[in-house]
């Protein structure tokens, strides 16, 4: 669709098999789509627009969640103002659905600005993983993590843990 000119995240629906959830970095919507590209459900997550990068899904305490990474930072100007939106995955229906969005606020252990691209959720360890873009000085990216629980909120800034470095041969 025109409102998703650049898809930045895609994950299979766990609630409605045969559908993908997709998200663009140029809108505030998550959409359900068939493999043939037919759009169905629209979830609007109203906020002041930021560079959305990455979408993941997973199960926590027998509930399916979707996670949206609000951490793209091409200008490296946000420093400690990075967020993850998460909400219970709805059933795919025609039209718009409303969800109760929760927000996790996080920063990086070095206290600097980063430009991340990927979010992943580990159902076994209940961890969120974030991968930042490579550093142009040494051509590496970094994988970070933080434990996930539904008690996390916007008021507390959670600091990521550095996991490992990625180079060109690792990807």
What are these regions (language model features)?
Residues 1-171:
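Sequence/structural signature of beta-propeller domains
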